[in-house]
């Protein structure tokens, strides 16, 4: 299977990964060690909905790997992969959110937030901590606490910032059937 990317998709990955890194440097601490409220997942969710699951996956993988490299504590692959999977899962359901058609009403907001909340619960509450236990032999109690807090924090930040970004984006799109011939 050969995957070909358009120039627009390559640019989306590059800009998305760069935004992931820059926004990811803003850390709002939580009471759980090594866990903070992260705002970059709202941008990743936006790009996943607009460009699809592969772009969302790449934005998360590349952006998180670069961010981890820059902050100096090394690459934490289980969480890097979880970031990519978040974008993948959200992007898989893009056809249910109509922002590309210029529509993002209460139904779309509800669907988007159900998708992102489930994706956050899956990747941060299950996959990342499970990977930490299996691969890094981390204490299960510690990493599941981190994962649950990260999942809740990311879910709330994407619900707020991601919804606002998608509302703004939908407003820039022409609604289907809105143009009429005079």
From Swiss-Prot:
Keywords recorded for this protein, A-Z: Cell membrane, Membrane, Transmembrane, Transmembrane helix
Protein's recorded name: UPF0397 protein SPD_0432
HAMAP family: UPF0397
Record bears the keyword Cell membrane: yes
InterPro entries reported for this sequence: ECF_substrate-spec-like, UPF0397
Transmembrane portions of the chain: 10-30, 46-66, 73-93, 109-129, 148-168
Pfam families: ECF-ribofla_trS (PF07155)
One GO cellular component term: plasma membrane
NCBIfam families reported for this sequence: PRK13661.1
Chief place where the protein resides: membrane
Membrane topology value: Multi-pass membrane protein
Disulfide bonds: none
Taxonomic classification: Bacteria, Bacillati, Bacillota, Bacilli, Lactobacillales
Organism whose genome encodes this protein: Streptococcus pneumoniae serotype 2 (strain D39 / NCTC 7466)
Entry keyword annotation includes Membrane: yes
Domain of life: Bacteria
Family: Belongs to the UPF0397 family.
Localization terms from the record: Cell membrane
